[in-house]
UniProtKB/Swiss-Prot annotation:
Function: Catalyzes the condensation of ATP and 5-phosphoribose 1-diphosphate to form N'-(5'-phosphoribosyl)-ATP (PR-ATP). Has a crucial role in the pathway because the rate of histidine biosynthesis seems to be controlled primarily by regulation of HisG enzymatic activity.
Pathways involved: Amino-acid biosynthesis; L-histidine biosynthesis; L-histidine from 5-phospho-alpha-D-ribose 1-diphosphate: step 1/9
E.C. number: 2.4.2.17
Cited InterPro entries: ATP-PRT_HisG_long, ATP_PRibTrfase_cat, ATP_PRibTrfase_CS, ATP_PRibTrfase_HisG, HisG_C, N-reg_PII/ATP_PRibTrfase_C
Cofactor: Mg(2+)
UniProt organism field: Xylella fastidiosa (strain 9a5c)
Name of the protein in question: ATP phosphoribosyltransferase
HAMAP family reported for this sequence: HisG_Long
Amino acid sequence: MSASTALPVRDRLRIAIQKSGRLTEPARRLLTACGLSWRQSRDKLFCYGESLPVDLLLVRDDDIPGLIAQGVCDLGIVGRNELDEQAASRRRNGLPVPYQTLRGLHFGQCRLMLAVPEEWEWQDISQLTGKRIATSYPAILTDWLQTHHIAAQIVELSGSVEIAPRLGTADLICDLVSSGATLAAHQLKPVIQIMESQAVLAGMIRQPADARAGLLAMLLRRMDGLLTLRDSNLLMFRAFQEHLDALTHLLPDADPLVQLPDDGSGTLRVQTMCHGTITWQRLEELERAGAQGLMVLTVERSLA
């Protein structure tokens, strides 16, 4: 074991992720891409960092904000919906919110929506007055209802929210929607979006000042290098000087063109980072505009 890995236990960085769920595998892939690896404990809830002194806790997603607030974990990967729900609940109870969103991670996207039975003739939010709304996000929903001056009854459920109207325990629901297939299966239709959500990296507002500070800065830098390159590719080609303006016009989502030293062919060697999809049709447009020898290269990581 290297000296850098053998730090005192609480000088090791701790990251909490969902033990089992839709965010688990994307979170592990992201952290692995950041250069982290672990040795898993027998109970499979704690993973000891081997490549770096960064340990992993596998927990319920709704436990992650609390673990960060208590200082048990330094970071957590959790849905913004869960983070905001617990923050809203803490504020309503007069408690401080000691954590913050450090990075949006661009996976686990969904929306918190109000959904009503398909037979409803939906017109506007005035129809919510006096209605019973089933949800697992009572604090977020309460804030939204108060903002819009709507008096409605909240029916708090821990799961299976979508079945509440059919059981007669609620008139409509407020729940997470990804594809909408679950709503359709229960004869519900979305009518109002409360918030957009995605997986986020959360951490304490007051950052650690010991050995963990350097680890945190390094991890964030690596993560930024990965997130910045998401859906990005390195485009390389040759072109004559007089064609560069037209080629630049065809690359609105690219960084400024970089001209490489002349290789003696009479054409310029050019490269740029494109932050969008490069389709075959797009390559053919560039070729017609004067680009030669086009190559698209995948870039896995970068340090700015």
